[in-house]
């Protein structure tokens, strides 16, 4: 019966299917296995892009939902800094982030002019990390650079203090604008789960804490409408 009701609502809904491309700023906020700092979350921002498909349906009087399938790539780097007391050697790191996302948002569209809407939305996103690679680089006083670490944090054993789970759930809130078949949407996603594989750091009486957040802004076009 419920399936029949849902199907009937979708048949009468205003529906769009399209594509979107935009800017993504994932942020890992993680604590470290250091006594006295176990409650401090250190943010590490990444900058990149996302691209994907989107389905949008307005069911009744502006209320509806939007869902999609996105791919996100982002990267970050740190400045060179001295590894020890002397100026050299210096160390730096590079990070690369690949992720698939399934957002499902409940939304309300305010029609401010003919086929022109302001949009408010909120909802969960299921994220699956394909890889989160971190490379450590070392530079000597002659400018020679060597790589001393290259790990995928999703593939590490849970006893490694860097090990993270690829599966994440966020809750987002945002706003948007649509004119005809063109749209702009932006918002912030708050991480809901601890991304560490273990509840505590191996060999230490310190619990792991953290979350994955994300800023995003997307431009898109609907190529199908009913």
Show where each model-derived region lies.
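Outer-membrane beta-barrel channels and translocator barrels
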Residues: 58-62, 111-115, 180-182, 224-226
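Helix-adjacent hinge/juxtasegments
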Residues: 93-99, 106-109, 114-115
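Membrane-proximal, glycine/serine-rich, low-complexity loop/turn segments characteristic
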Residues: 14, 117-119, 123-129, 189
């Amino acid at each position: 019966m419920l399936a029949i009701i849902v199907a009937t609502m979708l048949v009468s809904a205003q529906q769009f299917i399209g594509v979107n491309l935009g800017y993504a700023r994932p942020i890992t906020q993680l604590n470290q296995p250091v006594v006295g700092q176990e409650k401090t979350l250190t943010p590490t921002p990444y900058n990149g892009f996302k691209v994907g498909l989107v389905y949008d349906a307005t069911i009744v009087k502006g209320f509806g939902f939007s869902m999609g399938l996105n791919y996100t790539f982002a990267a970050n780097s740190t400045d060179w800094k001295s590894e020890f007391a002397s100026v050299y050697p210096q160390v730096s790191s590079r990070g690369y982030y690949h992720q698939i996302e399934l957002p499902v948002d409940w939304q309300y569209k305010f029609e401010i002019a003919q086929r022109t809407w302001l949009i408010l939305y909120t909802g969960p996103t299921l994220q699956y990390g394909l890889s989160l690679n971190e490379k450590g680089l070392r530079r000597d006083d002659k400018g020679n650079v060597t790589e001393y670490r290259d790990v995928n944090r999703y593939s590490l054993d849970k006893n490694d203090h860097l090990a993270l789970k690829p599966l994440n759930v966020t809750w987002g809130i945002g706003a948007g604008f649509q004119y005809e078949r063109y749209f702009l949407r932006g918002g912030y996603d708050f991480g809901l789960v601890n991304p560490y594989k273990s509840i505590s750091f191996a060999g230490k009486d310190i619990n792991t804490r953290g979350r994955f957040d994300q800023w995003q802004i997307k431009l898109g076009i609907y190529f199908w409408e009913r």
